[in-house]
Amino acid sequence: MELQNVPFTEARAREMVNVSAGFRKMLKNKKAPLQDHIRISTIFLVVLSVILVVILAVGIINRSIFFLICSGIYMVLIVLYALSVAGMHKGIKTYMKLGSSGKRRTVLEEDGVTLEVEGSTTTKFLWESFKWVRIYEFNILCVAKNDQFRDCLSLPIEHLDDLKGFLAEHNIELEFIEGEAYGK
């Protein structure tokens, strides 16, 4: 498996933490922009459907081939839009559920080492004698112990075996630690 060096500055790391915290806060807000988006797109879909009914009615009453063809094309476009909106909303709701559930699931538990994720990002940090290791959307980010952020190894984790292989390859023995990576 090929590892890629990724420039990862302290500013970038803190920005990621701030964005993550801001997104979690937004998910807890009942008037979140995502929910507004769902409401607006649903209303828009209803309006489009009403317009379709009007065009179709005019075509039938006037027996106009042009109106019937236009309503057919318009109907196809509405169906495509509805399918895309439905898929998008399902994804949004799933992400919101994952982000706000507060439940954690174990990714790896072996030899006293436990890696856990909450939604798509971890709130747990892992300690090794030289590195902070954080899993962020199934990428391992290695950060220097003294809080001076250096280039990190970024490895997409698609399977559990990839994660085990990464830890074994780099001789990383981790002790499970709760809390933030800063100020330890």
Model-derived regions: residue spans:
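A membrane-cytosol interface segment of integral membrane proteins
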Residues: 139-184
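Mature, Sec-exported extracytoplasmic domains of Gram-positive
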Residues: 23-26, 113-118, 122, 157-160
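Conserved beta-hairpin
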Residues: 82-124
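A structural detector for beta-sheet-dominated domains
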Residues: 107-109, 116-118, 136, 156, ...
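N-terminal membrane-targeting/pre-transmembrane regions
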Residues: 1-51, 55
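Phosphoinositide-dependent membrane-docking surfaces
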Residues: 113-114, 123-139
